[in-house]
């Protein structure tokens, strides 16, 4: 039977991609349905209990700047907050928070259940309704059919998921959850390129069986960082430390002696695992010269005795896992409460997607999260938000939107996936962005919130706070530009005490702030320039904008040069065999990828700058040279 009410957008899956997609579509006023096999696992952290990190924290801030959920949820659930790379430049500083799994899940579910225009329904999906190469709905396991103008697939590791522990394996979506086999088979019938990937997770340890007294503690930062631009540290629950132990030669011997029982090394697992989150087996074999690896013992929550040993992801048999765990300092009597495992699952070639994350072959069908070949909650959340907002726009007969590489890490992520594809689980790093000085955590709202407002993602409260911050930045910069001190002034001595070289001529507040030895806090403690801003976010922007003004201006020039041809559109129906002068290799690659713009075409391996020039000349001659807004 058909459900009586049609929807604008259906989201399939309630993980980090699905929850952001559902919230985005509903915030934009579209009638949205979130289908999940279990309402109790909405926002579940399937692997590590943490949000953020290098590159990943940047994505979380961008999701937040667009009105998303993840940063708000972790502010309510984070039990240890740190700024990574705090001693380095602002471009690579990143926020990371240890999470209480239960509090995080509760925060996500509460937000979903209180979001207007959003209905949540518990049923696994087994089929899609596709008519004339357009998706028009979904069918659940009990045969209930839902109609919609757009469908977003965010099914994580559930498609034909298979768990491996040693040489034993069984079908599962993740530990404790069933796989989605009928939907996997249905999707394989569609004109989509499907492959397999794998990821893994470590065994969980009973904290009561660990001797923490012999281990080094790692505390969070004080003052505590905050993730959301709308958040504050008073929202954070109780803060707790993590602990550090190490593997040793005994650990490594155990692993080497049991490699024949590893499903990866025995050839049982075909899928490729994440390069930047390798199993302990991989680490021992790939870095054979190292006699130890650092392991972080991370609490899973304030009311849980489970510890997540970050760094020993493994699919070795359980008896070997016990030996590995007990070989490490402080863990000699440790008990495992959940075994580690590897999971293999279907993923779809993201080169078959438009930058909006809509399928090139099935109209109205969007893909987000691990099924696009990514790894990590943050990468999934960012894709979910983008897919959800574009599904909402499609259902409202509006054009799609995707950020440029120069605009957001989300733009880098999507462009990398849709242009280059991936053969291994993709994770975000700051090094992937060529314009990272412009794409900082601290300015994510300045880059994206205005666009979020135009798209209908940003509510009145966030918009008012954003504009207040902009006004504070502008007013303070004007104040510092127009406030001067001279070498003969009464306050010159006070100023000189903070300088490596004394004043030799008149200087404004901005002149002084540009000096590497002068911070904004120091400057505004001096009589001529006091008081400083109470708005900490605006104060941070003033300092960064002034100190890095020259570098930022130079990078902005680079972006503008690059954008001259970046946004030149390529017709979807263009047969590149018509373009004389292109090599057969370039023609084949362009016809295979069907890039949407010159910028995307230029990043395809083998497409040379000369080929791009030929293409631009041809487009001009044909009168087809046009740029996107």
UniProtKB/Swiss-Prot annotation:
SUPFAM superfamilies cross-referenced by the UniProt entry: FAD/NAD(P)-binding domain
Transmembrane segments: none
KW Protein transport (keyword) present: no
Disulfide bonds listed in the record: none
Keyword Flavoprotein among record annotations: yes
Molecular function as annotated in GO: flavin adenine dinucleotide binding
Entry cofactors: FAD
Swiss-Prot/TrEMBL keywords: Cytoplasm, FAD, Flavoprotein, NAD, tRNA processing
Positions bound to NAD(+): 273-287
Gene3D superfamilies: FAD/NAD(P)-binding domain, GidA associated domain, C-terminal subdomain, tRNA uridine 5-carboxymethylaminomethyl modification enzyme MnmG/GidA
GO cellular component: cytosol
Biological processes per GO annotation: tRNA methylation; tRNA wobble uridine modification
Residue sites binding FAD per the record: 13-18, 125, 180, 370
UniProt cross-references to Pfam families, sorted A to Z: GIDA, GIDA_C_1st, SAM_GIDA_C
InterPro entries noted in UniProt: FAD/NAD-bd_sf (IPR036188), GIDA_C_N (IPR049312), MnmG (IPR004416), MnmG-rel (IPR002218), MnmG-rel_CS (IPR020595), MnmG_C (IPR026904), MnmG_C_subdom (IPR047001), MnmG_C_subdom_sf (IPR044920)
PROSITE patterns named in the record: GIDA_1, GIDA_2
Localisation: Cytoplasm
UniProt cross-references to PANTHER family, sorted A to Z: GLUCOSE INHIBITED DIVISION PROTEIN A, PROTEIN MTO1 HOMOLOG, MITOCHONDRIAL
Family: Belongs to the MnmG family.
HAMAP family: MnmG_GidA
Function description: NAD-binding protein involved in the addition of a carboxymethylaminomethyl (cmnm) group at the wobble position (U34) of certain tRNAs, forming tRNA-cmnm(5)s(2)U34.
Subunit structure: Homodimer. Heterotetramer of two MnmE and two MnmG subunits.
Protein's name in the database: tRNA uridine 5-carboxymethylaminomethyl modification enzyme MnmG
Species, as recorded: Citrobacter koseri (strain ATCC BAA-895 / CDC 4225-83 / SGSC4696)
UniProt gene name: mnmG
């Amino acid at each position: 039977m058909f459900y009586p009410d049609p929807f604008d957008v259906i989201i399939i899956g309630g993980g980090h991609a699905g929850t952001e997609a559902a919230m985005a579509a509903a915030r934009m006023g579209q009638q949205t349905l979130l289908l999940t096999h279990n309402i109790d696992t909405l926002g579940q952290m399937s692997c590590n209990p943490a949000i953020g990190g290098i590159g990943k924290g940047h994505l979380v801030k961008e999701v937040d700047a667009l009105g998303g959920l993840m940063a708000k949820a972790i502010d309510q659930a984070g039990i240890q907050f740190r700024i990574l790379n705090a001693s380095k430049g602002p471009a690579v500083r990143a926020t990371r928070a240890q999470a209480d799994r239960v509090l995080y899940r509760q925060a996500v579910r509460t937000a979903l259940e209180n979001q207007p225009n959003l209905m949540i329904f518990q049923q696994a999906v087994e089929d899609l309704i596709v008519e004339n190469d357009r998706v028009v709905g979904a069918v659940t396991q009990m045969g209930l059919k839902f109609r919609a103008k757009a469908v977003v697939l965010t099914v994580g590791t559930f498609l034909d998921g298979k768990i491996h522990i040693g040489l034993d394996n069984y079908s599962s979506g993740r530990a404790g959850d069933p796989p989605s086999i009928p939907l996997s088979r249905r999707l394989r019938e569609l004109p989509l390129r499907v492959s397999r990937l794998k990821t893994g997770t470590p065994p969980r340890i009973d904290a009561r069986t660990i001797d923490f007294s012999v281990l080094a503690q790692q505390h969070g930062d004080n003052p505590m960082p905050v993730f959301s631009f709308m958040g504050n540290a008073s929202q954070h629950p109780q803060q707790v430390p993590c602990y550090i132990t190490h593997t040793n030669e005994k650990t490594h011997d155990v692993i080497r002696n049991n490699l024949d029982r590893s499903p990866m090394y025995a050839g049982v697992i075909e899928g490729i695992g994440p390069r930047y989150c390798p199993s302990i087996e991989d680490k021992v074999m790939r870095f054979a010269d190292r006699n130890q690896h650092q392991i972080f013992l991370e609490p899973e929550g304030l009311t849980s005795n489970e510890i997540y040993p970050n760094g020993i992801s493994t699919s070795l048999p359980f008896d070997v896992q016990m030996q590995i765990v007990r070989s490490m300092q402080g863990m000699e009597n440790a008990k495992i409460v959940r075994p580690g495992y590897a999971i293999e699952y279907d993923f779809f070639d993201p080169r078959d997607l438009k930058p909006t994350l809509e399928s090139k072959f099935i109209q109205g069908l969007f893909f987000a999260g691990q099924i696009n070949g990514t790894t990590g909650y943050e990468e999934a959340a960012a894709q979910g938000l983008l897919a959800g907002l574009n599904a909402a726009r499609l259902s409202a007969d509006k054009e799609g939107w995707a950020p440029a590489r120069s605009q957001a890490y989300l733009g880098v992520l999507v462009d990398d996936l849709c242009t280059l594809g991936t053969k291994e689980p993709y994770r975000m790093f700051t090094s992937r962005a060529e314009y990272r000085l412009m794409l900082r955590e601290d300015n994510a709202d300045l880059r994206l919130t205005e666009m979020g407002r135009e798209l209908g993602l940003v509510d009145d409260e966030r918009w008012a706070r954003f504009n207040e911050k902009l006004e504070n930045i502008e007013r303070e910069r004007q104040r510092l530009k127009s406030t001067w001190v001279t070498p003969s002034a009464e306050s010159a001595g006070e100023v000189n005490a903070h300088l490596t070289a004394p004043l030799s001529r008149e200087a404004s507040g901005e002149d002084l702030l540009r000096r590497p030895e002068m911070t904004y806090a120091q400057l505004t403690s001096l009589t001529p320039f006091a008081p400083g801003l109470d708005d900490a976010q605006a104060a941070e922007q003033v300092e960064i904008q002034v100190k890095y003004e020259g570098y930022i201006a130079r990078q902005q020039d680079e972006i503008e040069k690059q954008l001259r041809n970046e946004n030149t559109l390529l017709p979807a129906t263009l047969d590149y065999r018509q373009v004389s002068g292109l090599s057969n290799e370039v023609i084949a690659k362009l016809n295979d990828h069907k890039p949407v713009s010159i910028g995307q075409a230029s990043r395809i391996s083998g497409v040379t700058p000369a080929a791009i020039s030929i293409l631009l000349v041809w487009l001009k001659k044909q009168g087809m040279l046009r740029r996107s807004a």
